[in-house]
Amino acid sequence: MKDGFLKAAAAAPKIRVADPAWNALEICKALDSCYAQRAKLIVLPELCLTGYTCQDLFLQERLLEESLEGLQTVLEHTKGHDALTFVGLPFEKDGKLYNVAAAVQDGRILGLVPKQNIPNYGEFYDCLLYTSPSP
């Protein structure tokens, strides 16, 4: 931090739909670029570990498991770095599916932030898949 400011970065890695392992490697490449520029806050796209357009594939346990494995790859990559990073992925808890941003830093998950406003208009059918967290 310099003069009360920190360097923030928005990274947009290449993404393959329903390929969390490949996406995790691309995310790690993007993080390296952010680390090289000394970013202390890094945000990645919504559902970047799976791609946004998986539709019914989000209901497959295999994709959810692979996205957690991809998150583990990213976690390992963040070890030794103090940048607070937000990584998007689907997350299932108690039979409910959430669209979350995982807050990670130095190899640790600090928390999961579920998407609050689930759209239900136009081309968005997120409400058919995701649960909005209770207030």
Question: What is the predicted role of each segment?
Answer:
Residues 130-135:
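Conserved small/polar residues in nucleotide/adenosyl-binding loops
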Residues 1-41:
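N-terminal glycine-/serine-/threonine-rich phosphate-binding loop
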Residues 33-121, 125-128:
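Cys-nucleophile CN-hydrolase/nitrilase-fold catalytic domain and related Cys-dependent amidase chemistry
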